[in-house]
Amino acid sequence: MTSAPRPRPTLDDLPLREDLRGKSPYGASQLAVPVRLSTNENPHPPTQALVDDVVRSVGEAAVDLHRYPDRDAVALRTDLANYLTAQTGTRIGFENVWAANGSNEILQQLLQAFGGPGRTAIGFVPSYSMHPIISDGTHTEWVETARADGFGLDIDAAIAVVSDRRPDVVFITSPNNPTGQSVSLTELRRLLDVVPGILIVDEAYGEFSSQPSAVGLIEEYPTRVVVTRTMSKAFAFAGGRLGYLVATPALIDALLLVRLPYHLSSVTQVAARAALRHAQDTLGSVATLIAERERVSKKLASMGFRVIPSDANFVLFGEFADAPAAWQRYLDQGVLIRDVGIPGYLRATTGLADENDAFLRASARIAATDLAPAAASPVGAP
């Protein structure tokens, strides 16, 4: 006699940490649709020369796959330092650079070292949703304060809350995801003058920004500023999962205390180095994407949408009577964009010209039925 199958266990059956119960994992929808404009990747595929270089480099590394990789990734960090020196105009050495599996691992290591029980991190929302998730995962108290109307950073309000709360970690995302605005060096200096711990400037979209990189502030504020970046956006290397930071060498010494051993595989290291060798060709698409972003923004505004001015490779736009319903209407027309949880707004990645055209055609139809009554306003209007 066959016994009845046991029911499959659920999370409720597991001895999960109580602070994780009821929470949802991070992640954008990954759907097979004709137009995918939801995760802010560079839509331009790698050149054949880059593909060939990656294949050759991985093949050469494969003969040593029975050995652990260079745990400090010195060659990769040297290449990243050379790229940053050329891109930002600030002299950077390999000892100022640290790399990991995407910038999220970088952020996690930072909070493992500088956050934790009894410590506080502050962010200005809406902003990158992984900041509070990583804070929770490291038992760092998360405090959030709202951005100004129009989603810009109110620097005076930021200074006031940092002065009052005295957090151990402050997050500034520039350009901000999901709203798109950059923060000037003048504003960052004002904030750094009152930050008691460290300021993490998240520059995941830094190559698109009209503002200079905050790496120029590291020499001036060596114990207080760290800049995080990624190769997943402008660098068209999202599948390679490579993030990095720039800071004073002592801060990197602190991360060595919490990083996992051999965290960055030899395959990842050589593939990322190959991508860096082709940086000039890959980043040639940045100007094209900026021009497309501006074209899309103007078209959306002409349809009656409110478009938040962006310094990244995406636009936040609205105002919808029901943003989740509007998101579904885009999907029904074969266009996947992102509902980032801001009431009345959706975010669209800047894609290839034909992808943007498909998005705009869908937007024209949706504008006729889904906009809130007071939505029509010029680009950037508050």
From Swiss-Prot:
Comp. bias regions, Basic and acidic residues: 9-22
Record-level GO BP terms: L-histidine biosynthetic process
UniProt cofactor(s): pyridoxal 5'-phosphate
Region (Disordered): 1-24
EC number: 2.6.1.9
An example Gene Ontology molecular-function term: histidinol-phosphate transaminase activity
Catalysed reaction, written as an equation: L-histidinol phosphate + 2-oxoglutarate = 3-(imidazol-4-yl)-2-oxopropyl phosphate + L-glutamate
Pathway(s) where this gene product acts: Amino-acid biosynthesis; L-histidine biosynthesis; L-histidine from 5-phospho-alpha-D-ribose 1-diphosphate: step 7/9
InterPro entries per record: Aminotrans_II_pyridoxalP_BS (IPR001917), Aminotransferase_I/II_large (IPR004839), HisP_aminotrans (IPR005861), PyrdxlP-dep_Trfase (IPR015424), PyrdxlP-dep_Trfase_major (IPR015421), PyrdxlP-dep_Trfase_small (IPR015422)
Segments passing through the bilayer: none
Alphabetically ordered keywords of this record: Amino-acid biosynthesis, Aminotransferase, Histidine biosynthesis, Pyridoxal phosphate, Transferase
Database matches in Pfam families: Aminotran_1_2
Subunit structure comment from the entry: Homodimer.
Protein name per its UniProtKB record: Histidinol-phosphate aminotransferase
